[in-house]
Amino acid sequence: MRVLAISGSLRSRSSNRALLDAAASLLPAGMTWQTYEGLTELPYFNPDDDEDGRPVPLAVADLRARVIAADGWVISSPEYAHGVPGSLKNALDWLVSCPELPGKPVLLLNASAAGGSFAQAALAETLRTMSLHLLEDSLTAPFLPRKLQEGGALEPGAARKLRDALEALAAAIRRRPPQ
């Protein structure tokens, strides 16, 4: 099963990226992982550029191909001003018209210092609007740097929770009817 991971943060030393990197080391058997690195390459969403028959920009076509090929997603997003970063929302706006998305399972992670509940709620609303299957096993890891050990591994309690969330994603992918 193929999973696409997306960090909503553009920071080079992002806690959300560190959380995705930690998750990549805890994958259930049979799960492969690809981290999307192209948020900065996406042009601003303009519905005029996404009309039937018009070719979308290359960066958008690449994102769509990766999302369509994935059996599930993991999104780790910070919280900025009680919301989702604009770069992540922009990427999701480009994906709204993809007919292959409804029902795909998505696991949400958040490593914001204060817990990120506002961003999680906003992101969940957007993903539900896109008809994605949002897992209840979403995970927040406030103050993540305190939970990271030497080499970027999570402390055992946090690692167990993240592994359980990834197992729930794997189960949701297995339950989804073939497309």
Q: Where would I find each of the regions flagged by the language model?
A:
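Short, glycine-/small-residue-rich phosphate/pyrophosphate-handling segment
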Residues: 104-143, 157
